[in-house]
A protein has these predicted regions:
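Active-site neighborhood of HAD-like aspartate-dependent phosphohydrolases
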Residues: 1-50
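Short glycine/proline- and acidic residue-enriched helix-loop micro-motifs
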Residues: 51-59
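Short, acidic loop-to-helix structural element flanking the phosphoryl-transfer center
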Residues: 58-86, 91-97
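Hydrophobic anchor at the start of a short beta-strand
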Residues: 83-84, 109, 148
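Substrate-recognition "cap/lid" segment bordering the active-site pocket of phosphatases
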Residues: 89-144
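Asp-based, Mg2+/Mn2+-dependent phosphohydrolase catalytic module
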Residues: 119, 135-190
């Protein structure tokens, strides 16, 4: 199967980093449990951009700690022959640091894409399953005929309750939900 996997808030917990940057730079608290939709309304666009830039610098990227079971799950899927496309809204300039981080933590990948239009790239690559936290990306992928899954967060919980999205609280649960699908759809990487 051809699998696309997001990074921030999917392979590792990103919200704490973003929230820390907002508090340090602007004195604005961004409580995780209160982030009930995809828009971050407590920050102006320029403030959000600065916080994202800070959290996507090389030092911050290389310090990222993956979620428990994320690395082992993705590595197992890759070893089973699944194509792994890692995708992120990170700026293209973050590609090198992101590739080093993935190698450093042990996540194998066949393709890495850092740009904003993830779903178009997924369609271009023939991706069959997208794992992402963004409700916008999940819905666009469903519209494109791509299966979707997510780690549950406050901003995507409602989508999990209403749409055909495979959801789990953590990577262990996500792997349990996806493994039978992946066994049925196994295909050697092209």
């Amino acid at each position: 199967m051809r699998i696309a996997i997001d990074i921030d808030s999917t392979l590792h917990h990103y919200w704490d980093r973003l929230s820390d940057a907002a508090l340090r730079r602007f004195g604005i608290d961004l409580p995780y449990e209160e982030q009930l939709d995809w828009g971050i309304t407590r920050l102006r666009h320029d403030q959000l951009h600065l916080c994202i830039k800070e959290t996507h610098c090389e030092k911050a990227i290389l310090a990222g700690e993956p979620y428990p079971d994320a690395v082992d799950t993705v590595a197992r899927w890759h070893a089973e022959g699944h194509f792994i496309h890692v995708t992120s809204h990170r700026d293209p300039d973050a590609w090198d640091a992101t590739a080093r981080w993935l190698t450093q933590i042990g996540v194998p990948f066949d393709d890495l894409y850092c740009a904003h239009d993830k779903v178009s790239r997924c369609v271009e690559l023939g991706i069959e399953l997208l794992i992402d936290d963004s409700p916008e990306n999940l819905l666009r992928a469903v519209d494109a005929g791509i299966l979707v899954a997510t780690i549950v967060h406050p901003w995507n919980r409602e989508l999990c309750e209403e749409e055909d999205v495979m959801c789990a609280d953590d990577w262990r649960g996500l792997a349990a939900k996806l493994d039978s699908l992946l066994r049925r759809r196994a295909r050697v990487r092209p």
